[in-house]
Amino acid sequence: MSITAERKQALIKEYATKEGDTGSPEVQVAVLSERIANLTEHFKGHKNDNHSRRGLLKLVSQRRRLLDYVKGIDQTRYQALIGRLGLRR
């Protein structure tokens, strides 16, 4: 199941660096993490859904690239972001 518009707006509001910020890497990583979590739950009941599994792998790769970008810009921002999201890296 995809994420609702209300949940996406809540994530944007929570992770935005300034008012109206929807494209910062922090916001993008937060939205991707929510989508990844939803797909992970989906796979608990649909183990053989290989088409969605490919989409999940693409999302994970995109999130990894964004996290690497943030890490290259500012190490403290990176550490704060993975701490807030509860990611292990």
UniProtKB/Swiss-Prot annotation:
Signal peptide location: none
InterPro entries given in the database record: Ribosomal_uS15 (IPR000589), Ribosomal_uS15_bac-type (IPR005290), uS15_NS1_RNA-bd_sf (IPR009068)
Family annotation (Pfam families): Ribosomal_S15
Superkingdom per UniProt: Bacteria
PROSITE patterns: RIBOSOMAL_S15 (PS00362)
Gene3D superfamilies: 6.10.250.3130, S15/NS1, RNA-binding
Gene Ontology CC, one term: cytosolic small ribosomal subunit
Biological role: One of the primary rRNA binding proteins, it binds directly to 16S rRNA where it helps nucleate assembly of the platform of the 30S subunit by binding and bridging several RNA helices of the 16S rRNA.
The family this protein is said to belong to: Belongs to the universal ribosomal protein uS15 family.
Assembly description: Part of the 30S ribosomal subunit. Forms a bridge to the 50S subunit in the 70S ribosome, contacting the 23S rRNA.
HAMAP family referenced in this protein's UniProt entry, alphabetically: Ribosomal_uS15_B
Protein name listed in UniProt: Small ribosomal subunit protein uS15
Gene responsible for this protein: rpsO
